[in-house]
A protein has these predicted regions:
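SF2 helicase/translocase NTPase motor core
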Residues: 2-49, 71-72, 82-179, 222, ...
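Short, amphipathic alpha-helical segments that act as regulatory/interfacial helices
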Residues: 52, 102, 208-212
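Active-site catalytic microenvironments for nucleophilic, acid-base chemistry
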Residues: 53-54, 80-84, 213, 217
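Pre-Walker A (Motif I) flank of P-loop NTPase domains
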Residues: 55-60, 87, 137, 190-191
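Walker A/P-loop
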Residues: 57-77, 166
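Hydrophobic residues on the short alpha-helix immediately C-terminal to a glycine-rich phosphate/catalytic loop
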Residues: 65, 77-81, 101, 210
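P-loop (Walker A) phosphate-binding loop of NTP-binding proteins
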Residues: 65, 94, 198
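Conserved P-loop NTPase motor "coupling/switch" region that bridges the ATPase
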Residues: 110, 135, 160, 178-226
Length: 226
């Protein structure tokens, strides 16, 4: 059976299918970024490819120094997921960086996002939406809000969770660090990318803590790690 489509439609479909392929090499990644308004550097592309091929099956840590473009690297990763129609995406960051994240993703990668905060969240609940996080939109929220709404985040089938300034959660191995432990539990079963310029500051246990957020079984329990 022959399908009658125009040449233009054929090109569009081919382009669409190419973008949906997994980013297992540079060619597929290039397809999802062909419209991006950003000059990528080799190390940013390499970091993104590492995240896709990470030996830590549940995610990776992007730990470039300040100014080397970790946000761009995250944008590359988010763009690829978006192009594959894996659009349940969550960015957790400090409250003062929410608008910056939203602006950069839109301006540089044409990725629309929703900043989830108390007012918009409550309005959604009042409108009968059972879980405002459960949407095929890129959602951005603060660390504090993620802690407060952890139960909703946990119930959402995220394709990817990005945690910016992740060193703020580095003491997750301490039970008294409630924000870190609550967020860790909420995203435990999801693929995660942690972003920090300082994965290790005072103790090797901080690195243990960050890695445990991605996968509890990489280093084993804290007693064995010590």
């Amino acid at each position: 059976m022959r399908c009658n489509i125009t040449d233009y439609q054929a090109v569009y479909i081919a382009n669409f299918l190419t973008r949906r392929l997994p980013a297992n090499d540079i060619n597929k990644l290039t397809a999802s970024l062909q419209d991006a308004q950003v000059d990528l550097t080799p190390h940013q592309v390499e970091a993104a490819l590492f995240a896709f091929k990470s030996p830590l099956s549940k995610g990776a840590i992007l730990a470039d120094e300040v100014g080397l473009g970790k946000t761009i690297e995250a944008g590359i990763i988010l763009s690829q997921h978006w192009s594959e129609h894996k659009r349940r995406l969550l960015v957790i960051c400090p409250a003062n960086l929410r608008k910056q994240w939203s602006s950069e993703l839109l301006e540089k990668f044409y990725l629309p996002s929703v900043i989830m905060e108390t007012k918009s969240f409550n309005a959604s609940i009042e409108n009968g939406i059972f879980n405002p996080f459960d949407t095929e939109n890129l959602v951005i929220c603060s660390l504090q809000f993620a802690k407060a709404k952890a139960a909703y985040i946990k119930r959402t089938n995220w394709d990817l969770v990005i945690i910016d300034e992740a060193h703020r959660l580095r003491n997750v191995y301490k039970p008294q660090n409630r924000i870190a432990n609550t967020i860790k539990e909420a995203v435990e079963s999801r693929k995660k990318i942690l972003m920090t310029a300082t994965p290790l500051q005072n103790s090797i246990l901080e690195l243990y803590g960050l890695v445990s957020i991605i996968d509890d079984y990489v280093f084993g329990d804290i007693k064995s790690f010590k």
